[in-house]
Amino acid sequence: MAGKKKSKSDSVPLDLGNIKPLEKLQPVPKTRSSSITSIESADEPGTMKQVLLPPTIREFDELEQFEAFVRDETWDNEFDYFHGRLHYYPPFVMKACHDDVEKIKPTVNKNSKKFRRDLQHHIQKHLIKDLEKCCGYELNFGKGEVVETDSKVTWKFKDETDHGFSKEEEDMYDRHWRLELDVTCTNESAMVDVEYKSIPL
C-alpha cells in the first residue's frame, strides 16, 4: 500500500550544510499510540497481542524531496518509524545527459559496468552521507550486500547499531531502531529505486 506523493510546498528547503544533528533522544511521540493495533497471536491462538502497524509509505521522484522527508521525520521525532521510497535518475546520469532524460542512452543500466561503478560510488560517497546528515545521527551501514538477478541488482544495507547514542539513553526512552536501505537498478533503464525504512525494535 503506497502513500501519497509529498508535494514540494510541504517542506522547508533542504540545506545539507545547515542541518543540526540530533543531540539527544526524546520520548516516543504520543501520536504513535494510534498506530498500535491488536491482532491474534500466532503463538497462542485465542489470545490477542498489540503490534505496531507499519508506517505509511511515502513516495518521491526527486532526491532532494526524499532527503527533506528524512530530515523532517527527525524534526518530528519520528526518526525511528518511517518508510520512504525514491524513484529517480541519479545525479551522475542527469549530469551526463545535461538534464535531458531523452538523451539518456539505453545502455545506461545495470548491465553497464561503468553505470554500476558510478552508482556504487554515488551510494557510498553521496547518498548514505547525505542521509546521515538528514537523519542527524550516525549511520553504520558498512559495505552492504549485493543481490543480483538477470534483471536487477540490489545493494542491501542494514544498521542495527546504537546510532551514536548510549545504550542507557536508548533504554531510558525505549528508542531502539533498525535502519534498512535498499538501492536497486534494473537492466531496462538508468532509473534507480531506493527504499529506506526505520523500524522500531
UniProtKB/Swiss-Prot annotation:
Pfam families: RGI1. Residues 31-40 have a biased composition (Polar residues). GO terms for biological process: energy reserve metabolic process. Residues 1-48 are annotated as: Disordered. Gene3D superfamilies: Respiratory growth induced protein 1. It is found in: Cell membrane. One of its GO terms (cellular component) is plasma membrane. The keyword Nucleus does not apply. Keywords: Cell membrane, Membrane. It is a peripheral membrane protein. Involved in the control of energetic metabolism and significantly contribute to cell fitness, especially under respiratory growth conditions. Belongs to the RGI1 family. This is Respiratory growth induced protein 1. The gene is RGI1.
